[in-house]
Amino acid sequence: MIIPAFDLINGEIVRLYKGNFFNRTKYDINLYKRLKDYEIKGVKKIHLVDLDGAKNIKDRQIKVFRDIISYTNIPIQIGGGIRNEEDINMFLNLGVKKVVIGSSAIKNKTKVKKWLKIYGPNVIILALDIIIKNNNKEIAIHGWQETTNITLEEIIEYFSPIGLKHVLCTDISKDGTLSGPNNILYKDIVKKFKHISFQASGGVSRLKDLLSLKKTGVKSVIIGRSLLENKFTIEEALKCWQSE
């Protein structure tokens, strides 16, 4: 599945370079027109990130997301500093279909385990952002400001017994760079964890990247910058993914 992504600050579409808030690009794009176009073209899911909420929970863009969700019929998954059940309930009550949990899955594993039981594996997506160090897939947290000694494999193995199903995996070195995805990484983790539905994120810049990612076995690809900068059209991306 092709999943277009929009990162939002104060209701505006932005892209961070390698997760850096001080190195960002603002896009003069009408989000509502874009969503309407995507709905007509057959997009099945949208990925939204609340960058304000990720920095400070008091700055959540609740009105923005309420407006978006009431406007479009495309199912929404959302992330950005989700740290408690109040956040999850608030987003689900707005109409969000899936919530993306990042740092909490590392810092508060017991709590996230409980969420998987309460809400079910089809609602919770774990976002595992990794840095490759000495062939280890080390997880970074808190907007990639802090690296851990915990590997992606350890986290998936920890949550799998209670039904973990969805993982969004980003190679930080690729995010927002248009330098091509890390196909070796995705091929490896898909082979290791056949029960997980992986979403790949980072580095896609051309249609060839989508074809190569599909061959790795990932179920979905999140695309941000390359669609925002018209490297290819949504029609081309959807056709490309379906054609293989």
UniProtKB/Swiss-Prot annotation:
Gene3D superfamilies: Aldolase class I (3.20.20.70). Its EC number is 5.3.1.16. GO terms for cellular component: cytoplasm. Keywords: Amino-acid biosynthesis, Cytoplasm, Histidine biosynthesis, Isomerase. This is 1-(5-phosphoribosyl)-5-[(5-phosphoribosylamino)methylideneamino] imidazole-4-carboxamide isomerase. Disulfide bonds: none annotated. InterPro entries: Aldolase_TIM (IPR013785), His_biosynth (IPR006062), HisA_bact_arch (IPR006063), Isoase_HisA-like (IPR044524), Isoase_HisA-like_bact (IPR023016), RibuloseP-bd_barrel (IPR011060). Signal peptide: none annotated. The keyword RNA-binding does not apply.
